[in-house]
Curated annotation (Swiss-Prot):
Source species of the chain: Laribacter hongkongensis (strain HLHK9)
Keywords of the record: Amino-acid biosynthesis, Cytoplasm, Histidine biosynthesis
Cross-referenced CDD domains: HisRS-like_core
A GO BP annotation: L-histidine biosynthetic process
UniProt gene name: hisZ
Record flagged with keyword Amino-acid biosynthesis: yes
Biochemical pathway: Amino-acid biosynthesis; L-histidine biosynthesis; L-histidine from 5-phospho-alpha-D-ribose 1-diphosphate: step 1/9
Gene3D superfamilies, alphabetized: Bira Bifunctional Protein, Domain 2
GO molecular function, one term: histidine-tRNA ligase activity
Name under which the protein is recorded: ATP phosphoribosyltransferase regulatory subunit
Family: Belongs to the class-II aminoacyl-tRNA synthetase family. HisZ subfamily.
Amino acid sequence: MHNWLLPEHIADILPATARQLESAKAAMLERFRRYGYELVSPPLIEYTDSLLTNADPALDMQTFKLDDQLSGRQLGLRADMTPQVARIDAHLLAHRQGVTRLCYAGSVVHTRASGLMRSREPLQVGAELYGCYDLAADIEIIELMLSTLAGVGIDAVTLDLGHLGVYRALVREAQLDGETEQALFAALQAKDRASVEALTADVREPFCSAFRHLVDLYGPEAIGKARARLPGLPGIRAALDDLERLAQIFASRARISFDLTELRGTHYHTGLMFAAYAEGWAEELARGGRYDNVGRRFGRARPATGFSLDLRDMIRVLPQTHPSKGIRVRAADLSRLADEVARLRAAGEVVVVDYLGETAADLHCDRELVCREEGQSLEAAPAHP
């Protein structure tokens, strides 16, 4: 086996791509800052009992684990930064009693790629808002998500909205046992009508029919269908009202669709869920939702809403960036020009020392600092070495 081979779905980032990613990341973080979000940087590795706080089997399966040689405890490489940021809000920023806005950008590592063309080392960028139960907080987060995507040229977006409140209200009122609920959850996720019908055969009405209707409750007209076909439970009415209000607010910014069987993150989220899609993309560009009380394990249960995206997944639409043209200085002249080289670099110029007699183009330079009898001179670089 060649020793330069990397694991599947792991790749090096070369200079041109690295410039694109860093430029886009900086622009996103600056946008977050203008909305009042403060940057935090959690560690790449933590004890698994803090990384895996919500009994989420999917996150557990995605987490690389190893033993700590110092403590003997199990460590995990983070697969998602959201629980880490929730820990920071709940524990390290516990003195803050009002709304806290935090953002982050960093690599996470997955045991398996989440899609055929996706990396196992996503560059996760996201924003979280803590301390506000009101729908206004979700509106701010969705607005920030759409604005962030538009900032990298993705403005023809479909905003897909869902709400766990509908499913959970039905499960609670139908009094399903744990085993049936888990199987029904999987069947609804797969939109497997036959399995849903089999699993709800002994469920009393109106809940039997309601679960079966859920399979069809997706698309632009889903809210109207849901009001007509589902029981008028308070939790369901409130969830549908929220979805309808969000659709009205963002109708001018995105194509709106609904999916009341989109239940990914049910161990993680607690209510509203949303995702952004665009033509030509097989999977979502960004995803988020409400995950109230995620900080309970760290001593402070707080309402929370947020979104995240994988910046590496967007590389094909990110604006091209080009390296700044530099100034070449020949190695033989360096000692005599050292002060001027230092001054130019301090002023923000790129100064490249030519050790091998390369062309200015090879060194990405369009000027040359030369030594002449009458003194130093900054000139246009010749095409030849």
